[in-house]
């Protein structure tokens, strides 16, 4: 193609790009309609400035091409593309097709002219290096080409002649491009003093991130530019501006090493919109990309350390009342650590294995702020319904289900985010491809269990993830503090085996001395004195550790202390200032003390030693391993408010009295705390169980009074720096006290104005004081508290209390007046001290003792005995719940059951734990004491549907009842329509019976067809997708009558706005699931999104399937308007699969390469048949076999964008009897329970050393069920009546199945809890099914574990475990070993326990080569040897290459034959002396052998000798390919080869069935 037709808008600055473009230009035709433009930019309607490498106009349409000059090989791991360079370095890339697709759609939108012919822009990625080995899965190869393949694709005729581009159309495109303003690619852009790179490296719907450099200083930065869409309405533009200001305001306030650091905010910094400048490390990676590159090198403890980093950052944000709300893999940045202990530099790998995580993307964060000057930004620009539009698409799978609800709890959103990120860190995989897919799995009962993907994982990790990610917020952990406590349990369980070893490590002190104090772990010793117990958390200036002072006895001090380690030298100065302030204080029981008067200097860090304030019970001596003493926790008043809501009146009086006493003491000492708030009031629990409050954190006490900004937003007096004051004073200190008291009394902060302006900008006449949360106060003290706070929080300091004493007297008077009047509510009383326990010295009166351990059991017993008339005082509710309910006028259980659940949830002053407790009891008692909802079609159900609509939105309250009565709902917004529950939808779909009963048959026909429960809650017994014939038979009507009646209902449904909104939602779900999904999968997603009051899983699914069925029926009304098709699966053995599949058809706005619905359904059918064939195999097929078999099927025409997991799931959904495990194995749904128990090793019993047998936790039946369900979620068992059931057996049948599976277990009662659990029948002979940690091992003293203190021994054990796990399975493994130890390694690998069959590849090759030489003929053997050393390209070298290829043709089938021998149970084929693969250009042979091993038969092990086994495997100078996601690389440390790990004990690996993987 000549210049002119090919327009080079900008000459590329890269030589490789110029070469690639020239290669394409030479091959393109030079005639109409062909045209091309290279290297230009355009500005999309969204505001994004897009860079385009090449745009080609061809007869088949327009194509946007992204050029990639990659070398080596490219693979895909968990959706991330990984390039392995010829030098062996791995580089991660996002799938470039996604961005090109987005840019193509944006350009097509610009080219679209009103009234003109629609222009389609396809997308393509072109690899310009023909030597690149592309090993992408089939779904990732759509749109990926070499130069020749690209040109061939462009020359193809259009699939639809209506879309052919003619010469005239080509000229119109050229004119349109000129009109939209394609232009030269500016090399740089500017924002303030920063010059931007020309391509953004990341982007979202409303923003783009650029790398930038300062024009004058040598510093790099990340610049985020927020973009406003052209022509968007004012609300959208305002939402974008607010997102930018919100992110800037949050990060301007929240300074923490675990959050990205904002450098500067330019509200008008760029022509496109606001700009934010962030600090940026050039090697920063996103979390999912980091795990692809370094995940294999992280052990489970390293992964948990990263989880802790994230959780501590989020906890610190929550302490500042900031909530991220949208945690996802892309919002976590990974930065290599720059230094180790004592400031020493660390190596590259060590820097990446202990990185710093930083949370980014705070654009939809919230801050529940008070009203200081900075805080108003967060209130003024609070997230709205439009906020989710600012999130990138790849965050979708990580977002909490309720994010888009009207008012979701931000704490629960962040807890959920931490849970899914924990799942990602542990498994290396995202929880799902999309949120819709994940919701469907959650509704189907498949919780997130990392152990379903990772062998040998601690059960505590599963518990942590499941407790954080329950899809009902009320069932999640209620705070990040609880998450961290459960994380500590996980860390304890992971490190427990190492603690069981006899004797301390000899070099313990020395090892700890060299460690960076910031990185110490439990057991480390600092400065020879402080023994680390655990890490408490990380703040903005320091990291805190709980330690035991080994010199406490001689110094006569408390045994426990807290060390605050400064995060940097500058932050160390803050600790020094804090110590100076605290040294001036005399001892006081209510004020935290220094354990050491001067700051310490340990390991190059400044360290402050403080007394420990927390749970001191049972700390004077180490408890027995496994003892059941209560877990220590650090409690603050803030945590108590978060979990239980406002304080009961008696506690409020006592806590307030304490606070006044502490502040009075500080005034006498001449000190201002300057940061008084509930977070800084700790609760000490003494050994005798009494409590006292302690004021902590004096880090701001030494700040100059002129610095009026120091403090926490919301508690800082917003009028402190007015002209009449100008510096911090006692009024400001008392203002913080008043705000803290207000929060204790109500659970809320006072608020100035409506949040639209700063507090000092409010009208003094209208706002002399803030809004007091009077409704949240206890009625007994409400009037007195309102008067108190109106004076204490007055904007004019002259009208406040002049001194602390009158303020304290007024506070006491509130409670004195309340005690002298007839109480209108119950008041709680503090618990009496335990017998013989005297109150702690200085403890405030009225602070209740710590609750006994059995309190929860006592409450459960009381709750089980209640009736409707039972008073709340004896109902088993906690005092906090009782106090709150009394405030609502509720005094009995019956009154609570009759109270509206919705009103209860929204009541002010209610804490998270208290809310969960009340809701749980309300559900529990409701099921037992009142009629549970059985069907929405009862009169009561229809009335509740009407009530639901009344509460959907206040703005639309005039439309009450329109849906429930079948009237027009056209005025309801789409957002409101999508909030309608499934119960209310059922009342829309099924007409109410007339008074005269004339439409009774029609109503019953609809109910039966949709399979909705009757008035007794019974579902029709005619299948999950009833046939019209069955409905007619059930009603006694003719078969022809049903279609007639149904036609009228279809018309009515089609006209209903609620059904239209439901149809749009289902189409969106289909699009997000790859255009095909099972009806059940769609239904499960709807059940989570919409909700239903029915409790049973079968009933919930039936309600959702009814909604899907109605939309399918409506779709069939007008065939010409069909946008999706339905295909039933009548032969399925599982009833739920009978509902069949839905497939999205090609629509008006879809791309030309979109596959049709019939094509997709046919493909799914073929996948289902293949899955059924795999399920019938005698051996459970591995993931590699499944993917190979399914991948071999012909894909329908068009782009099918399914990842491997989606393909396997759809194959199972379209099958008759197949199901898929989370590991992508295929199994029959009626798999034998005995075999399932054996495959999952569900009978392994956790045995805690040192704990008596009667108190061993053992293994409960529920534990066994969970282990089986985690691996085989769709397993069914015989029900004894000729059918099958999902419920797994219990008691005797389960015990028999366990014994048949090889686990000799028996049921017995646990003494301390009274629960039934399994224990080994004979403990002394049970070593084959005991586990003491993540992997089973011998219980003999001296056993070496993967948690051994010696990392070399631990590495050897890990290698042993992985070798044993793969020795008798198919698959491919690359083993790296030190070069000098090859012979010993071969001997160990060939030992009986591993059974490797050593095969010398060099010997086979030479034998095959020698076989081609006939004695007495030419060439001779000597001639061949000379040719081997000939110059490359010479005649001899070319001739030798021919002989080598022939030799490999003989070697490959010989090795393949070995792989096929012996079946899956034989030992692996061990390839040694394999360097000839690389030397004689036979890496392709190795690839084919590896692929064969992955498909079944014997395993293939490749031994690769190297100078350093920890380096990426290489044969000579050639990188050895392997799949990291399948764990195919195993490092063999010197300790493993030397058998040191087996010298002092025997490692017993979990024996699994040979076909497991």
Swiss-Prot record:
InterPro entries for the chain: BREX_PglW (IPR049832), Kinase-like_dom_sf (IPR011009), NERD (IPR011528), Prot_kinase_dom (IPR000719), Protein_kinase_ATP_BS (IPR017441)
Source domain of life: Bacteria
Domain Protein kinase: 195-490, 530-816
Disruption phenotype: Strain is no longer resistant to plaque formation by bacteriophage phiC31 (a Pgl- phenotype).
Protein's UniProt keywords contain ATP-binding: yes
Binding site for ATP: 536-544, 564
Consequence of changing residue 677 to A: Does not complement the Pgl- phenotype of a deletion mutation, does not autophosphorylate
Domain NERD: 12-130
Disulfide bond residue pairs: none
Region: Disordered, residue numbers: 615-634, 821-861
Keyword ATP-binding: yes
GO MF assignments: ATP binding; protein serine/threonine kinase activity
This protein's UniProt keywords: Antiviral defense, ATP-binding, Kinase, Nucleotide-binding, Repeat, Transferase
Residue ranges, compositional bias (Low complexity): 830-849
Family annotation (SUPFAM superfamilies): C-terminal domain of RNA polymerase alpha subunit, Protein kinase-like (PK-like)
Induction description: Constitutively expressed, probably part of a pglW-pglX operon.
Function: BREX systems (bacteriophage exclusion) provide immunity against bacteriophage. Part of a type 2 BREX system. Previously called the phage growth limitation (Pgl) system, it confers protection against bacteriophage phiC31. The bacteria allows one cycle of phage infection, but subsequent cycles are impaired, protecting the original bacterial colony. The system undergoes high rates (10(-3) to 10(-4)) of phase reversion, i.e. loss and regain of phiC31 resistance. Autophosphorylates when synthesized in vitro, cannot be expressed in E.coli.
Protein family: Belongs to the protein kinase superfamily. Ser/Thr protein kinase family.
Name of the protein described by the UniProt record: Probable kinase PglW
Annotated gene: pglW
């Amino acid at each position: 193609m000549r210049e002119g037709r090919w327009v080079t808008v900008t000459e590329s600055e890269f030589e490789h790009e110029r070469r690639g473009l020239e290669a394409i230009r030479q091959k393109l035709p030079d005639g109409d309609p062909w045209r091309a433009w290279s290297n230009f930019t355009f500005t999309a309607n969204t505001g994004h400035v897009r860079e385009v490498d090449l745009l080609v106009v061809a007869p088949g349409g327009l194509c946007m091409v992204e050029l990639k000059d990659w070398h080596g090989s490219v693979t895909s791991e968990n959706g991330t593309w990984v390039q392995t360079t010829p030098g062996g370095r791995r580089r991660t890339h996002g799938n470039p097709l996604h961005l090109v697709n987005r840019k193509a759609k944006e350009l097509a939108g610009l080219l679209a002219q009103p009234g003109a012919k629609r222009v389609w822009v396809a997308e393509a990625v072109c690899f310009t290096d023909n030597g690149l080995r592309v090993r992408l899965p089939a779904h990732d190869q759509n749109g990926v080409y070499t130069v020749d393949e690209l040109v061939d694709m462009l020359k193809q005729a259009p699939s639809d002649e209506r879309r052919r581009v003619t010469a005239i159309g080509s000229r119109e495109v050229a004119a349109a491009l000129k009109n939209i303003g394609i232009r030269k690619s500016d090399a740089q852009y500017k924002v303030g003093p920063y010059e931007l790179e020309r391509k953004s490296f990341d982007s979202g719907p409303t923003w783009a991130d650029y790398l930038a450099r300062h024009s004058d200083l040598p510093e790099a930065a990340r610049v985020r530019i927020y973009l406003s869409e052209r022509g968007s309405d004012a609300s959208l533009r305002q939402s974008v501006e607010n997102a930018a200001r919100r992110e800037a305001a949050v990060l301007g306030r929240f300074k923490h090493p675990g959050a990205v650091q904002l450098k500067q905010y330019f509200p008008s910094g760029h022509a496109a919109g606001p700009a934010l400048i962030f600090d940026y490390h050039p090697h920063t990676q996103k979390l999912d990309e980091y795990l692809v590159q370094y995940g294999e090198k992280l052990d489970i403890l390293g992964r948990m350390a990263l989880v802790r980093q994230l959780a501590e950052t989020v906890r610190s944000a929550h302490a500042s009342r900031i909530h991220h709300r949208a945690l996802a893999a892309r919002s976590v940045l990974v930065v290599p650590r720059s230094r180790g202990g004592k400031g020493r530099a660390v190596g590259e790998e060590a820097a990446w294995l202990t990185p710093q995580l930083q949370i980014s993307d705070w654009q939809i964060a919230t801050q529940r702020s008070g009203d200081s000057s900075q805080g108003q930004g967060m209130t003024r620009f609070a997230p709205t319904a439009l906020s989710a539009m600012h999130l990138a698409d790849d965050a979708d799978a990580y977002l909490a289900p309720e994010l888009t609800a009207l008012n979701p709890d931000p704490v629960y959103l962040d807890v959920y985010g931490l849970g899914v990120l924990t799942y990602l860190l542990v498994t290396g995989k995202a929880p799902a491809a999309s949120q819709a897919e994940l919701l469907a799995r959650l509704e189907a009962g498949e919780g997130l269990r990392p152990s379903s993907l990772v062998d040998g994982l601690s059960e505590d990790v599963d518990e942590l993830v499941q407790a954080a990610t329950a899809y009902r917020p009320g069932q999640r952990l209620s705070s990040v503090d609880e998450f961290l406590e459960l994380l500590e349990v996980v860390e304890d369980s992971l490190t427990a085996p190492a603690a069981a070893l006899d004797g301390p490590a000899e070099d313990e002190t020395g090892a700890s001395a060299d460690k960076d104090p910031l990185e110490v772990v439990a057991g480390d010793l600092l400065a020879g004195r402080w023994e680390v117990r655990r890490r408490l958390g990380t703040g903005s200036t320091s990291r805190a550790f709980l330690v035991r002072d080994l010199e406490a006895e001689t110094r006569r001090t408390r045994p426990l202390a807290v060390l605050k380690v400064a995060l940097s030298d500058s932050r160390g100065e803050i600790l020094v200032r804090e110590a100076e302030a605290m040294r001036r204080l005399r001892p006081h029981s209510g004020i935290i003390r220094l354990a050491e008067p001067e700051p310490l200097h340990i390991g190059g860090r400044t360290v402050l030693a403080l007394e420990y304030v927390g749970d001191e019970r049972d700390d004077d001596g180490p408890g027995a391993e496994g003892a059941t003493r209560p877990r220590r926790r650090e409690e603050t008043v803030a945590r108590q408010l978060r979990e239980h809501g406002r304080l009961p009146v008696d506690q409020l009086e006592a806590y307030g009295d304490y606070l006044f006493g502490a502040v009075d003491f500080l005034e006498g000492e001449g000190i201002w705390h300057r940061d008084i708030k509930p977070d800084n009031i700790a609760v000490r629990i003494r050994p005798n169980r009494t409590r006292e409050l302690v004021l902590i954190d004096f880090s701001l006490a030494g700040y100059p009074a002129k610095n009026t900004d120091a403090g926490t937003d919301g508690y800082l007096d917003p009028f402190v720096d007015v002209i009449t004051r100008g510096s911090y004073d006692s009024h400001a200190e008392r203002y913080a006290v008043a705000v803290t008291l207000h929060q204790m009394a109500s659970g809320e902060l006072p608020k100035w104005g409506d949040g639209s302006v700063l507090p000092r900008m409010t009208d003094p006449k209208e706002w002399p004081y803030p809004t007091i949360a009077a409704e949240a106060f206890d009625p007994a003290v409400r009037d007195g508290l309102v008067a108190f706070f109106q004076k204490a929080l007055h904007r004019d300091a002259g009208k406040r209390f002049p001194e602390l004493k009158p303020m304290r007297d007024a506070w006491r008077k509130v409670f004195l007046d309340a005690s002298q009047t007839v109480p209108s509510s119950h008041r709680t009383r503090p618990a009496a001290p335990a017998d013989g326990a005297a109150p702690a010295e200085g403890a405030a009166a009225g602070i209740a003792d710590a609750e006994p351990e059995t309190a929860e059991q006592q409450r459960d017993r009381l709750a089980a005995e209640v009736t409707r008339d039972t008073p709340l005082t004896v109902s088993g509710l906690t005092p906090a719940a009782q106090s709150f309910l009394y405030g609502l006028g509720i005094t009995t259980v019956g009154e609570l059951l009759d109270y509206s659940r919705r009103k209860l949830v929204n009541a002010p002053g209610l804490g998270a734990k208290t809310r969960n407790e009340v809701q749980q009891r309300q559900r529990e008692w409701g099921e037992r004491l009142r009629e549970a909802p059985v069907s929405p079609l009862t009169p009561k159900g229809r009335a509740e549907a009407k009530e639901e609509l009344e509460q959907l939105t206040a703005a639309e309250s005039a439309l009450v009842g329109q849906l429930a009565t079948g009237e027009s709902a056209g005025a309801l917004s789409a957002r409101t329509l999508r909030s309608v529950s499934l119960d209310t939808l059922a009342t829309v779909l099924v007409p109410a019976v007339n008074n005269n009963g004339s439409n009774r048959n029609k109503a019953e026909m609809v109910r039966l067809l949709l399979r909705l429960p009757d008035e007794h809650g019974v579902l029709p017994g005619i299948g999950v997708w009833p046939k019209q014939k069955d409905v007619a038979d059930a009603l006694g009507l003719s078969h022809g009558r049903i279609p007639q009646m149904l036609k009228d209902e279809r018309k009515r449904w089609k006209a209903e706005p609620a059904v239209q909104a439901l149809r749009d939602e289902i189409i969106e779900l289909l699009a997000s699931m790859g255009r095909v999904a099972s009806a059940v999968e769609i239904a499960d997603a709807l059940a989570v999104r919409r909700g239903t009051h029915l409790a049973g899983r079968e009933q919930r699914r039936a309600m959702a399937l009814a909604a899907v069925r109605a939309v399918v029926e409506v779709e069939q009304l007008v065939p010409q308007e069909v946008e999706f098709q339905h295909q039933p699966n009548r032969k399925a053995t599982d009833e739920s699969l009978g509902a069949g599949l839905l497939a999205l058809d090609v629509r008006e706005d879809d791309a030309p390469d979109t596959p049709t619905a019939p094509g997709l359904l046919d493909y799914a059918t073929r996948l289902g048949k293949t899955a059924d064939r795999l399920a019938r195999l005698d051996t459970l097929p591995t993931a590699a076999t499944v993917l190979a078999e399914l991948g071999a099927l012909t894909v329908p025409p068009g782009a099918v964008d399914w990842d491997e997991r989606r393909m396997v799931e759809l194959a199972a959904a379209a099958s008759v009897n197949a199901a898929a495990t989370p590991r992508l194995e295929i199994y029959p749904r009626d798999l034998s329970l005995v075999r399932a128990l054996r495959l999952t090793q569900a009978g392994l019993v956790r045995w805690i050393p040192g704990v008596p047998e009667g108190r061993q936790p053992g293994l409960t039946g529920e534990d066994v069920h969970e282990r089986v369900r985690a691996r085989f979620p769709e397993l069914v068992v015989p029900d004894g009546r000729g059918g099958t059931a999902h419920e797994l057996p219990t008691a005797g049948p389960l015990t028999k199945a366990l014994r048949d599976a090889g686990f000799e277990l028996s049921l017995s009662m646990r003494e301390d809890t009274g629960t039934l659990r399994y224990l080994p029948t004979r403990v002394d002979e049970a070593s084959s099914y005991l586990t003491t940690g993540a992997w089973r091992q011998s219980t003999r003293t001296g056993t070496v574990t993967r948690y051994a203190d010696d990392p070399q021994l631990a590495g050897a054990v890990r290698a042993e475990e992985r070798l044993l796990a793969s020795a008798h399975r198919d698959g491919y493994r690359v083993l790296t070993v030190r070069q000098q130890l090859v012979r010993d390694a071969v001997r160990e690998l060939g030992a009986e326990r591993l059974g490797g069959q050593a095969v010398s590849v060099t010997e086979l090759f030479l034998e095959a080569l020698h076989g081609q030489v006939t004695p007495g003929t030419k060439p001779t053997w000597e001639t061949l040897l000379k040719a081997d050393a000939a110059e490359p390209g010479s005649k001899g070298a070319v001739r030798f290459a021919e002989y080598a290829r022939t030799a490999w043709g003989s070697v490959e089938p010989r090795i393949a034959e070995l792989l096929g021998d012996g079946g899956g149970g034989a030992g692996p084929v061990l390839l040694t002396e394999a360097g000839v693969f690389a030397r004689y250009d036979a890496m392709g042979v190795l690839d084919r052998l590896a692929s064969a091993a992955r498909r079944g038969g014997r395993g293939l092990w490749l031994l690769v000798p190297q100078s350093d086994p920890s380096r990426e495997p290489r044969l000579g100078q050639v990188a050895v390919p392997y799949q990291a996601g399948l764990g195919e690389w195993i490092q063999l440390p010197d300790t493993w080869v030397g058998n040191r790990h087996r010298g002092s004990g025997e490692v017993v690996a979990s024996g699994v069935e040979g076909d497991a993987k």
